[in-house]
Amino acid sequence: MVRDWSACGSLLLVMTVAKDRGGPAVAGSGGGVESPELRAAYEVCEAEARQFAVELWAAAETLPVETRPSLYAIASWSAYTDRIIDEGPLEGREERLAQWSADTLADLRAGHSSHPLRRALVDTVRRWGLAEALIEEHLDSARADCAAVPVFETFKDQRRYLRGCSGALAELWVPLLEPRGPEAFRLMSVLGEACQVADLFEDLPDDLAAGRCYLPRQDLRGLGLDVDDLRRGEREEALNAFVDAQLAHWRGLLEETVLAPSTVGARYQIFVHTLLLGAQMHFDEVTLLRSRVLTQGLESLVTGDGRMSRRAARPGPGPVPGHIAVIADGNRRWAEARGLLADQGHRAGIRAVLRLVNAAQRTGIRHVTVYMFSTENWYRSQGEVAALFGAFADWFARGAQTVHELGVRVRWSGRRDRLEESLASSFELLESMTANNDKLTLTICLDYGGREELAAAARALAAEAVAGTIRPEQIGMAEVARHLYVPEMPDVDLLVRTCEQRISNFLPWHLAYAELVFDPAPWPDFDLARLRDAVDSYAGRERRFGGDAELPAQAGNLEPARNG
């Protein structure tokens, strides 16, 4: 079947606007359409997109109001095409699809249509000067998929399907997004392919049961497998290797598409970041499941009403750290290696933080602390500091509702007197909104320095001593901890630093007995597989906490004995 690639879903809502969106965005309110019939057609498209392509509908809410109706028109037409293939009696499906295709192309030639979905599509194509050949390419792919069971010998063959099914549609959108050159068209097409791979895995059990396999047969034969082995799910080692091969293909697409946000206008980059993050989150989920995905498929990361779904943890067999802290280093190097400006690296770094939150929840980690901006980072150029805080502001504006729906409690560790007032207020509002959440605690270290934190605690204790509320001999570790930025923060079990091998003035109080893992990858490349490797390394270590006993790594519930 042809699938609506927007249903790759995952975290398409991660950076969408807050829930108080206001009324519907219909062409005419921002698009200059005066015809009542055409306005009504666009309203039908939005309703259809909201019902049958909810993830894409929600992501479109990040777009300027004049752009959304056109995206709804394309999404609703594509979803309707998909439903012709998937719904209704088997007999006559090819004929119904052929008629719908012929009517669509005839309407495009005529410049008008009596069908509301096609009427809006025709107007969108003419309004933006979209390439009708891409619509024909998509319809050709749909007809081929409807006519015969798919057999893709190689990944190259599979990519031709991915291109026709989803890449062509993604490329069709590009003129809506203020493209910055021809590369935008190619990269958006690849992003469409990457999202479609996610959708293949989501529907895999149902497709296999129906005798349809969209994965390369060459990879199967190379491991001594056939399609029946995928359905049975019994040869775990070989099946894991097969899924790993698919992940390798997919990773190549994702690595290419990380450049896509930089190729569209600034107002549209959040939309592309959202789509890319959705594909990355699904990639991480398949990494977690491996061969289990063949029989279980992928859980949707959003519910039917567009809210984030809270999925159960799937910890590995070994101990899991209760608290992981991350020095997220390498955004600038990541960007430079790809010919991008530093601000694109920082926005990719924000994506990686959201990706980490999802991965930590799935692996059973309860506390995550991320070093985002140090007291020393103020010495960077004004332009880079502004870019960093612009990325933070986007995160607060787009991600607050999502992390709240995931049950994440967000806290701020750092100085609160030097940030721009609106940014500080946004962070404090997010803290308040998520204060009662208990699925995971995410602490963001912003304008944080470890020595400054300890000095501030010392100043507060000195003031208490001068006021006579505490005597110097009464000051112990508990009293110091009471005056840290986040007094209730537990000790760190595992510290991960990307790119470099330094602690960089990070959490000196909490790192006293932490295990350290240094990952050479730049922060935007940190995914679930790298987190799993770090956790596996942690699980294999003996933690003594300064004593003689050989204690295994614990899940954050062991209070080490310290000399007072």
From Swiss-Prot:
Keyword Cell division: yes
SUPFAM superfamilies: Terpenoid synthases (SSF48576), Undecaprenyl diphosphate synthase (SSF64005)
A molecular function GO annotation: magnesium ion binding
Active site positions, chain numbering: 329, 377
Entry keywords, A to Z: Carotenoid biosynthesis, Cell cycle, Cell division, Cell shape, Cell wall biogenesis/degradation, Magnesium, Metal-binding, Multifunctional enzyme, Peptidoglycan synthesis, Plasmid, Transferase
Pfam family, one: Prenyltransf
Cofactor section: Mg(2+)
Reactions that this protein is recorded to catalyse: 2 (2E,6E,10E)-geranylgeranyl diphosphate = 15-cis-phytoene + 2 diphosphate
Binding-site positions, substrate: 330-334, 346, 374-376, 378, 380, 497, 502-504
Cofactor, free-text remark: Binds 2 magnesium ions per subunit.
GO terms for cellular component: cytosol; plasma membrane
Residue stretches spanning the membrane: none
Cell division keyword on record: yes
Annotated Mg(2+) binding sites: 329, 515
Gene Ontology BP annotations: carotenoid biosynthetic process; cell division; cell wall organization; peptidoglycan biosynthetic process; polyprenol biosynthetic process; regulation of cell shape
The enzyme's E.C. designation: 2.5.1.32, 2.5.1.-
Metabolic or biological pathway: Carotenoid biosynthesis; phytoene biosynthesis; all-trans-phytoene from geranylgeranyl diphosphate: step 1/1
HAMAP family linked to this entry: ISPT (MF_01139)
Subunit structure: Homodimer.
Protein purpose: Catalyzes the reaction from prephytoene diphosphate to phytoene.
UniProt family annotation: In the N-terminal section; belongs to the phytoene/squalene synthase family.
Alphabetized PANTHER family for the sequence: DEHYDRODOLICHYL DIPHOSPHATE SYNTHASE 2, DEHYDRODOLICHYL DIPHOSPHATE SYNTHASE FAMILY MEMBER
Protein's name in the database: Bifunctional protein CrtB/UppS
Gene name tied to this protein: crtB/uppS3
